[in-house]
Amino acid sequence: MSGSHSNDEDDVVQVPETSSPTKVASSSPLKPTSPTVPDASVASLRSRFTFKPSDPSEGAHTSKPLPSGSPEVALVNLAREFPDFSQTLVQAVFKSNSFNLQSARERLTRLRQQRQNWTWNKNASPKKSETPPPVKKSLPLANTGRLSSIHGNINNKSSKITVAKQKTSIFDRYSNVINQKQYTFELPTNLNIDSEALSKLPVNYNKKRRLVRADQHPIGKSYESSATQLGSAREKLLANRKYGRHANDNDEEEEESMMTDDDDASGDDYTESTPQINLDEQVLQFINDSDIVDLSDLSDTTMHKAQLIASHRPYSSLNAFVNTNFNDKDTEENASNKRKRRAAASANESERLLDKITQSIRGYNAIESVIKKCSSYGDLVTSQMKKWGVQVEGDNSELDLMNLGEDDDDDNDDGNNDNNNSNNNNTAGADATSKEKEDTKAVVEGFDETSAEPTPAPAPAPVERETKRIRNTTKPKVVEDEDDDVDLEAIDDELPQSEHEDDDYEEEDEDYNDEEEDVEYDDGDDDDDDDDEFVATRKNTHVISTTSRNGRKPIVKFFKGKPRLLSPEISLKDYQQTGINWLNLLYQNKMSCILADDMGLGKTCQVISFFAYLKQINEPGPHLVVVPSSTLENWLREFQKFAPALKIEPYYGSLQEREELRDILERNAGKYDVIVTTYNLAAGNKYDVSFLKNRNFNVVVYDEGHMLKNSTSERFAKLMKIRANFRLLLTGTPLQNNLKELMSLLEFIMPNLFISKKESFDAIFKQRAKTTDDNKNHNPLLAQEAITRAKTMMKPFILRRRKDQVLKHLPPKHTHIQYCELNAIQKKIYDKEIQIVLEHKRMIKDGELPKDAKEKSKLQSSSSKNLIMALRKASLHPLLFRNIYNDKIITKMSDAILDEPAYAENGNKEYIKEDMSYMTDFELHKLCCNFPNTLSKYQLHNDEWMQSGKIDALKKLLKTIIVDKQEKVLIFSLFTQVLDILEMVLSTLDYKFLRLDGSTQVNDRQLLIDKFYEDKDIPIFILSTKAGGFGINLVCANNVIIFDQSFNPHDDRQAADRAHRVGQTKEVNITTLITKDSIEEKIHQLAKNKLALDSYISEDKKSQDVLESKVSDMLEDIIYDENSKPKGTKE
């Protein structure tokens, strides 16, 4: 990796790209798309076409005559011939000339000549001979006549550190198939292999190309000729195996029709256990007895209408309710001439209200029945946990198991009392019988970790026993031979540290979203049944039995120690050891679960340990891990570092690369343990989804599991199509008091129970989502009861440990609020924006609209969200407004820029002036820096970027942290334009820094993190809250500055946890900058009260927008109330 590099080096990428003004990623309303950016067809080949002069391998291809049909070599040749042009420009010209080498060369030659002429005659009139030739496509920067993107580095003295661009792809660096010799690991040598028995087993064909029904499977047919008991048993197993299907889009209709009976059966079986309820009586009782707010909510009507309904109580029957007129007297008097129409409407309205109430109650009944069914499965887990000495009962809705293994070593318990308060409540009571205590101790097994011998692996069963086991697949038995018995938990597990938490967001990145591929399979209902039959027999032949010979469930024992497949240097924390045992318990019971440990406690560590444990006990893969883009490479590194014996394959790359990857991974099926991919690909186009769907994964892990907390989202539907025997959701967020989220999590755990109830659930959630009255945040009694029941029932399936419980492993965290003053310029701007807010609120409240059509439209289109955003920007920095560059200046600028070659021919002064009018002072300054020959005199020359109350406070903080304490610091901001300003501030202060935001290439993000760890001379890392606020590990810094806070405090907490997590050795200080007497104080107060968080679902952008709009409305009301009275007093 390199340090600072000159800006003209083509083989160095500036990170992130948005730090260059070529990409406008800001809150400015001006967001033009530069025509220089290649379309999808070129973008998909970008990594192959990109000119890399430092790569000697490319030189060999450019010295020979260009072969026909080789645009890659042609593009490299052009780049070498014209090194004074950027790669982007060469690509754009090559494309605009239809990939014709000769035409592109001629065009670039003319551009070079034009640039030379302009350089020597920069003061000449643009109308002279140096004017570009009249080829409209030749000026991609200005062929619209408007101002395009802001280009170039605005600060030649920038102290930002850049890193060399990655030369290889993620797959090349981490693929086990590509790098088979990179890691060697000694597997257990004491395997007892019976070659004669193995020779009798059928050959397993791995190649999977199309859907073949079980009764048509060629493997199955091959057994018919064998006429052996094993062949017959195998054929029966294939016929009943649901997880072994390989869907093809040509066969989906057939599969859907064949699955219909299974779906119906599942629903019928489930309904049989649900007690019949007289729905009409329940609805009538609700109408007569319910609270007004509940009545309004379930009938999907206004509070006023609900009061009218209540005024006619009691109703003798539902028929009497339908025949009641719910119009008030004023409405009747004002519409006496329309009585007939109103009577019909009234009747229709009564029926509509009744239908809504009926649908809602039916939905809540469905929820209640599902909760009851889930409870029975929860009891199975609870009963086995009691064998460990754990009592699950209690008010807490989540498990917080800590150090269960230590409960059995009385002499080791004394030192852990402080961190085992929850354990003390969970252990068996003092009145337990001696037999119960013996049973509790009997389920804990350990082994000698100092032994050099590998953990013994189970010997293969004789063919006769294998045949018998397969014949009884529907009721699996434990193989209990004295020589072959394997204690399920007697082997062990462990893993590293580093988790990748919730980020409430999958940031907007370049995760290879190929728009032309966004056509999805219409998979029908078969996926619901295929995916989720968690009680079905596992596809692999090593399935661990859940029933012993005497018909009783075997005890899943608590094991101590780490797996032998983990690196010898790794040791597990006690709570992590407990977490792996809990995962194993749920896995053996074939029930999915949620690991919700607090952010920074090493969920990644526990997952990799669990995979190592599964391989050690011969539970085969492949497994799948779905992660946010920012954490992809970190996951791959963690696998390499902590479990080198596991064979990991990343599924990530461009469109063409992924096509090659699919072929490679299909050809090497069975040669890898885990596939790691991103959410954008797992829920992407049909090819990616189909490939992953047909891998027949054993375990699927969803990192940042909050993305699955909305069962009605498109992403949830796509991800649930990925088949798996066991699903694990990782999240650092606690359960919210939100019924929709709880039911989504339940569907994730036990999806087959939801098939017949899906419509009833959707009716409730859709109704709740569109409620617009003041009671929209109210949970009806039925909903609150369901929430309480659901949270209690889900307790066995959700494990959450908080940092305060494992504080002995983490240094303390200190949070501070640093108040900042508005400077004079900020105060003037802020007061002006306040008046706009007040006027907007007053006019809407009084129903006054301007007579001028333009002003009226402006008022109606404005929203509280936009107005509050303006106040937030004023609290941050005055350069986020156009205050310095007045109309007179931008008129001169729009005229001067026409002398630039990019705008001389097609530039339109009026269009350019209009574009400039929407830009902020900082954006206009960047534009001037970008065109120094014509606009340099308009640049800001007085360090205006240093003039802000927050910048003053930041300077003092940085001096204390960097100069006085010699420590590192992370600075987070929600806005990329603020990060641009911070770049100039830090460069002015001469602090070296790195930057990461949503536009930073995924392939380069880990390089930045590595650079920050390795280079002690780089004290600052600036990050966007959304892109850098989750998943990554930055414990080398122990100071965090939140430059601007989010509406949701969870976002800021995640950002802070980049430093306060497992691996941190110093005390962590988190400082939030808040401008006094500004909107930021109000936001902070709302955040402290955690308002609106229950409805927050970060994956669902619509829900996020609703949250921000709601908070903005509240803030506008607060501002209006605080300022209207003083204003009236003055008058």
From Swiss-Prot:
Q: Domain of life, per the record?
A: Eukaryota
| EC identifiers of the protein | 3.6.4.12
Keyword terms? ATP-binding, Chromatin regulator, Chromosome, DNA damage, DNA repair, DNA-binding, Helicase, Hydrolase, Nucleotide-binding, Nucleus, Phosphoprotein
Q: Name one GO cellular component term.
A: chromatin
Where does this chain mainly localize?
nucleus
Q: Helicase ATP-binding domain location, by residue?
A: 584-752
Assembly with partners or alone: Homodimer.
Q: Protein name, please?
A: ATP-dependent helicase FUN30
Please report the organism this UniProt entry assigns to the protein: Saccharomyces cerevisiae (strain ATCC 204508 / S288c)
Q: What is the lineage of its organism?
A: Eukaryota, Fungi, Dikarya, Ascomycota, Saccharomycotina
